[in-house]
Amino acid sequence: MLQHVVDGESELAKFNAETKKKYANFPEIVREDAHVYKDTDGYYVVKEEWQKPSNAFEKLKLAKDAMKTVIALNEIKTLGEKSGSTKEDFEKFEKELGDGDEIDHRLKWAGLFHRRKGHYGRFMMRLKLPGGLVSSEQMKYLASLVQSYGDDGCADITTRQNIQMRGIQLKDAHDIMINLERLNMCSLQSGLDNARNATGSPIAGIDPLEIIDTRPFTDKIQEYVTGGGRGNPEIANLGRKWNVCVVGSSDYFEHPELNDLAFVPAKSETTGEMGFNVLVGGFISSARAAEAIPLDA
């Protein structure tokens, strides 16, 4: 990701055009009555007539595009250099910054979640591990990183086959991201209004009853969502907790009915060719749940 950072806003349009070119075979369909338009840099923006009334998160995005500043212009490095090592340093840094949204919200586009109430000045970093796959080399690095923070460091395995690390200091974030990229991992677009970790079969490739191996498909989804680790503005302004999965067997380990977008393997009745049935609109939270419905496409 960080090796692709641009030098200034004048290069953003070119930067995003290169990303889009990689996916030129993906049709871009925007309805005439859509509430958004694409600006000159390639980022989707809510049309003025739909900006009021708006919820707090939408107002935050309208004020400053997180993908544009935090990711493409590498604001993480700049913020990290100013944030210091101690709680007192961080308090001074935040006071001088004068923008709590930058710390508490926009950094989530880079997978950094400030623990303001429970652990001020420390961050939880959520990765993106498509299908939950992690090598021994990758895990050793993650373990050493958590260990380096002593009693402040710990890690979680999430319900979406992912890993998130706690106790991270902002001053270290840039170097951590470089190491993640070196090891073919990233934390990009893992929080707030982005597609969450693409899940697949937990026993993909070794399940004797699997219909398809989900690993190549979750990898492709990861590649698209993150723009190959450089950020993809085409899919960086969604609703919160947007979930996608690929089903590998009839056991439905992936709970496709509870995902926003789910691909379920199916064989064509006419050609015998393998493909997918597509489900959309699944949702679950402590407040409500909705079952995904088939597109029949």
Please report, for each region that a protein language model flagged, where it lies by residue.
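Extended, compositionally biased low-complexity polar/Lys-Gly-rich tracts
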Residues: 76-79, 100
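Short, well-ordered strand-loop elements centered on a beta-strand within folded domains, enriched
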Residues: 269-283
